[in-house]
Structures are given as C-alpha cells and as structure tokens.
C-alpha cells in the first residue's frame, strides 16, 4: 500500500492511543537497540527520534503478529515476511503487556471481527440486525466470508 508522506505526517500528529519511549531494533542484521518515541495512532505505529517532531518511520499494523519475547520485550513481524522483525524493549513487563494488547487490537481486521461478533450478539438478544437501520447490513465487509469472528 502506498501513502502520501504529508498524509502520514499529519496522521502522526493526531492524538495517540498509546505513546512512550521504548528501545527499538529494526529488522536489519546487526542493527542495535535505539531509544525511540513510539506512538500508536489508529492502525499505524509511528516511531520518532526522541528529539524530533517528524516520524522516521511507520508500521501499518495489518496482517502482523505481535509476539512476547524475552522479559519486557516484544516483536512485530508481518505475515508476508515473518523473518523481518521489529523488536521493542519496554521499561516493565506491565508496560510490555499493555503495548502488546493495544497493538493486537489496532488492526482494521480486529475491529471488523469485533463489530461482526457484537452485531451477532445483539441480533441474538433482540432478534434485529443493528446494522439494518443504517442500510449496510448486507455489505460484504460486514460478513464473515467463511471465517469465524
């Protein structure tokens, strides 16, 4: 997916769901851990040099895995290239768990599945499709398409 640099910079300035200085090591062999300001905004994880306002990179959190690594650290890898991992070091195990939970819930796919799950629960309780009033109940994006919510 391609993004306009100005759009990404504008998005990076939006209020963050989470933000902290973390240790970060990129996927290149031999890369070292560097302190980065890391911001979660919608489904993007932006990272900044600690003394700069513009991001130096962004990860789109779709089709990715968030994995707990050694104590106080986690990694993000992408399904199309699982060997390419970004490692993050937190100040505590509690902070690590908070980041992992937030990152796992940040993807569009997670939100779509949650909507489908709660839509079905409401329909079971009320007998009515809550999306019907908006005229979108038959749209493909709100269907399971063979996958369980």
Swiss-Prot record:
Entry-linked InterPro entries: Boi1/Boi2-like (IPR045188), PH-like_dom_sf (IPR011993), PH_domain (IPR001849)
PH domain boundaries: 15-108
GO CC annotations, alphabetized: cytosol; early endosome; recycling endosome; trans-Golgi network
Domain of life assignment: Eukaryota
GO BP terms in the entry: endosome organization; receptor recycling; retrograde transport, endosome to Golgi
Name under which the protein is recorded: Pleckstrin homology domain-containing family J member 1
